[in-house]
Amino acid sequence: MFSGIVQGTGKISKIISKKNHITLEISAPKNFNKNLKKGASVSVNGICLTSLDNGKKNLKFDVINETLSKTNIGKARKGSLVNLERSITASTEIGGHLMSGHVHFAGKIEKIITKNTNKDIQIKSQK
């Protein structure tokens, strides 16, 4: 589970295409990977992905075709920036909303309305 509060921005350093998935390598901000364990859940642009290792050098994730078909992560390229969040724990302050990061479908941005320093984004469901 995640709070929905972005904890840092990572940069895609490598994308490896495979038969049924891609592997993403992402450089994360300093200390983001601290105590990360293989199998940990990390939100990448709101998508719950499973860490392939302990992230000592870069974060590494396999992204299956189902996830690629339901999200826009497949449009990311080497050098693209992504939002990152570690999963919450029993002692984590929840300052946002509980989110699973399990994406069911993509929506289309219909309109962006700027009000002072805020933006209202209208999204149309494709379902």
For each of these PLM feature ranges, what is it?
Residues 1-127:
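Conserved loop->alpha-helix
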